[in-house]
Amino acid sequence: MSKSLVIVESPAKAKTINKYLGSNYVVKSSVGHIRDLPTVGSSNGEKAKAISTKGLSAEEKSAIKQEKDRNALVKRMGIDPYHQWKANYQILPGKEKVVAELKSLAKKADHIYLATDLDREGEAIAWHLREVIGGDDARFSRVVFNEITKNAIQQAFEKPEQLNLDRVNAQQTRRFLDRVVGFMVSPLLWKKVARGLSAGRVQSVAVKLVVEREREIKAFQPEEYWEIDVLTQTQAKQALRLAVTQFKGKKFEPKNATQAQSAVDFLQHADYVVSDLETKPTHSRAKAPFITSTLQQTASTRLGFGVKKTMMLAQRLYEAGYITYMRTDSTNLSQDALKMVRGYIQSHYGESYLPSKPVFYSSKENAQEAHEAIRPSDVNTLAEQLTGMDKDAVRLYDLIWRQFVACQMPAAQYDSTTVTVRAGEYELKAKGRILRFDGWTKVLPTMSKNAEDQVLPDVQLNEKLHLEHVLPEQLFTKPPARFSEAALVKELEKRGIGRPSTYAAIISTIQERGYVRVENRRFYAEKMGEIVTDRLNQSFTALMNYDFTANMENILDQIANGEKNWKTELNQFFKDFSQQLSQAELDELEGGMKPNSLVPTDINCPTCGRKMAIRTASTGVFLGCSGYALPPKERCKTTMNLIPEAELLNVLDEASETKALMERKRCPKCGTAMDSYLIDPERKIHICGHNPNCDGYVLEQGSFKIKGYDGPIVECDKCGADMHLKLGRFGKYMGCTSCDNTRKILKSGEVAPPKEEPTHFPELKCEKSDAYFVLRDGASGVFMSAHNFPKSRETRAPKVAELALYRDRLPEKLRYLADAPQHDPEGNDAIVRFSRKEKRQYVTSEKNGKATKWIVDYLGNQWVERKK
């Protein structure tokens, strides 16, 4: 009897599903996407034939060139917007074996079930599988489930569906839109601004949010204000702290020390009388069960997880069958889920914690109500009962479980009291509240104590209070808060930008592109991010408009629902976009995109004496000689690195941001906060935060050090002086305070080991150049590289036989590598590799360019073959 083939996208999901299906099913994983549009640099098909342009007019030559460029672009993109959006999908590198196995199994199967995830991405993977496997479409069925439980799996297989091509087309539309913008705008940025830049349909809008917040902060000028508290004692000798709230019937808000002192002088001799007492019941309701965005936000604030980590852990929990699908914008709960959780609450917490009827929460507009909120698959499974999950996954599950249970429990009840006191024409208040019934907080305690969570002492109306102290405090208004990852997701969701399936990718992409950076879990806009945002805003107004981007998400929803034709929408977008692109490619004087301008200074070039200019590249802000614009023979390429002042590395919160803003110089031209950089120990330059839009700068002479440094200190391996954390054009590094020695900061945050001098092997020639190999020891272990790096970038793994031959040249700590076996049992050369996970070297071999299964480890001062 033939069996049915079930295809899912992940091995973990396949393993879980396999437990619930009988022996008549074979469950296999596609390990994600099996095909996609061509990757950058890949080229399939014949090379375009050269066309002779001899004897043609300039217009004809131009037309031929345009056609050639267009064809090259279409080939790189893998989609053809000029011919009905024909797509050139290719099997992904490394997926050939997976595809071959699935095709082989499909031939033997009587039916094929496509059980990929229930979102559009999952629908698209299912469609690609059907297209690649081929055959009669009637052999394929689509099964979807919100949770990987026995009941959900059985129900899905009892009612299989057909592939939803509308949802597939919505996914293709998003992919094609992103492809067009990325492949057609990025080259324009290379030409107009700087090499290596990129643009994205949603990515650029997300960067714009960070850039606008950065500029709000830089333009913000903190204003002084004062608050005054008065510490009193009741007739019963109990302490009561009061805040001054009004003066002469108006809000009390002194702006300076003089106004505050005037109030203090009066309050120190005033009589304090209780003028009003008010106690009223208040309550606090639980929040809705998690959707993708709220899970990401709460995991950030409660657990300290980044968006990417949260989704990775949630994916594992889902694939193991512990939670429902984690990409959702619906707060809806199924009737079965409500019955399950209400039964749990009743049996474990009692009737008083069970509302008379289920609690329902409204979802945002366009939410897919067919989906459920994120919840445990089985509320009876507690976090400590999970198996095969790491500690952080268990913590995330516990959070999801508690939110799910709490959302179906009654509100927490309080008695809130306000005491009002008169002191002449001043009014003072104290607020407190007493918890009467904990409700949902029994399961999900609040993170921090509310300022009003205090028990006020008993006082009587008209009671006179005894003055203890008047406590004035100087404060300053705070700038807008920087975005955290979670806060940026919240802002994207509020503006309708992106969807649950794309939030994590957006957050990761904008960091990888180098337009923003994250310090202390808060976003900072890089200068190049500001410049690119300005250029795109100027030339692609619609593309950078928040409402336009949100509307495009709605259009994608309509395509998925079969309400709009996907190619019609693509054609309309491409028509408008192409017009804007053509305009942007023109010269600036003709209305084209403005190039990346430099800001001249009075600083002399140390090489040629010409003036240096403030320049911005994808690696940061630096000084470059104005002579760089001259013809090649006269060109001066001198640059000077600018080191941001170190105190900017340690801004932890809005209060610190306020202090830093107050200490920063203001631009003499526009008043914006200036960014300060060290040129050398004698010169500091302050550059307008709006550079290059504003050319304001201030050069300061003196003797400079990094002031107030309290960061990590490492002993310099060359001179013994202290090395401090610094921030340069290429990111953080440790720099010596005495010599010019530097050390990298690894991705883990650890300081890289001191740089070892390479071991030279003039006898070992490179294959791709006239250079010879040297042995380098880096953060990823030992490797062979060209001696003249970076001129020649050739690298390879060291062979044990080579190390053994020149053993005496090796540093003492590496000589153990020369003692390893020089060949595997089949006679293949043994090579040295590095395990990132275990952070140690091991020896293996290769055959025909592919790794063998032979591995030898260095254990207990000897080389031991690993058991297969």
Curated annotation (Swiss-Prot):
Keywords of this entry: DNA-binding, Isomerase, Magnesium, Metal-binding, Repeat, Topoisomerase, Zinc, Zinc-finger
EC main group: isomerase
EC number: 5.6.2.1
Zinc finger extent (C4-type): 605-636, 667-694, 716-739
This protein's encoding gene: topA
Domain Toprim: start-end pairs: 3-148
Keyword Zinc-finger: yes
Role played: Releases the supercoiling and torsional tension of DNA, which is introduced during the DNA replication and transcription, by transiently cleaving and rejoining one strand of the DNA duplex. Introduces a single-strand break via transesterification at a target site in duplex DNA. The scissile phosphodiester is attacked by the catalytic tyrosine of the enzyme, resulting in the formation of a DNA-(5'-phosphotyrosyl)-enzyme intermediate and the expulsion of a 3'-OH DNA strand. The free DNA strand then undergoes passage around the unbroken strand, thus removing DNA supercoils.
Family: Belongs to the type IA topoisomerase family.
Binding site for Mg(2+): E9, D117
Annotated site location: Interaction with DNA: H33, R174, R175, D178, W190, R327, R513
Signal peptide start-end: none
Any Pfam family matching the protein: Topoisom_bac
Domain Topo IA-type catalytic: 164-581
Subunit and partners: Monomer.
Region (Interaction with DNA) residue spans: 198-203
SMART domains cross-referenced by the UniProt entry: TOP1Ac, TOP1Bc, TOPRIM
Keyword Zinc: yes
Active site positions, chain numbering: Y325 (o-(5'-phospho-dna)-tyrosine intermediate)
Protein name stated in the entry: DNA topoisomerase 1
NCBIfam families, sorted: topA_bact
GO molecular function: DNA binding; DNA topoisomerase type I (single strand cut, ATP-independent) activity; zinc ion binding
Species name: Pasteurella multocida (strain Pm70)
GO cellular component, one term: chromosome
